[in-house]
Design a protein with these regions (language model features):
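The short loop immediately C-terminal to the conserved phospho-acceptor aspartate in CheY-like receiver
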Residues: 15, 58-59
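C-terminal output helix
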Residues: 91, 109-119
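The feature encodes the CheY-like receiver
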Residues: 19, 61
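Acidic catalytic/metal-coordinating carboxylates
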Residues: 37-38, 64-67
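Active-site beta3 strand of CheY-like receiver
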Residues: 49-56
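Charged docking surfaces used in two-component/phosphorelay signaling
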Residues: 20-28
Length: 127
């Protein structure tokens, strides 16, 4: 945790129901959550130094989750990231590994897998 505060998780997903569901789950689990409805919204609005990790949807209009991560990597941001997708194709998995994604989570999400990722990211554990 940072400065004794609750860890901050950034969520980027174009589906409002998913964002709000994740916000509720993570709030109950002890995280502060900031949500964004697009990759551009995230790039424009987040103080990336505050978040301990990023949860990003792959399939969004205009910019996919992997495209957002590629932009962030070019900017030198190595924030621990989980990519969520309903179709984890071999190509998506390959690209995710190349971009340093810590975890690819398949929809529908399993809460325990997401919470394990968040705990590892908040602890600074690359596992």
């Amino acid at each position: 945790m940072q400065d004794g505060c609750r860890p901050v998780v950034a969520i980027v997903d174009d589906d409002e129901a998913v964002r709000e569901s994740l916000r509720f789950l993570l709030d109950v689990a002890g995280y502060d959550v900031v949500t964004f409805d697009s990759a551009q919204d995230y790039l424009d609005g987040i103080d990336r130094r505050r978040a301990v990790c990023l949860v990003v949807d792959q399939h969004m209009p205009n910019t996919t989750g992997l495209e957002l991560l590629a932009k962030l990597r070019r900017l030198g941001t190595g924030l621990p990231t989980a990519l969520i997708t309903g179709s984890p194709t071999p190509d998506i998995l390959r690209q995710a590994v190349a971009l340093g994604v810590m975890k690819v989570l398949e929809k529908p999400l399993v809460d325990d897998a997401l919470l394990r990722f968040l705990a590892a990211a908040a602890a600074g554990d690359g596992a």
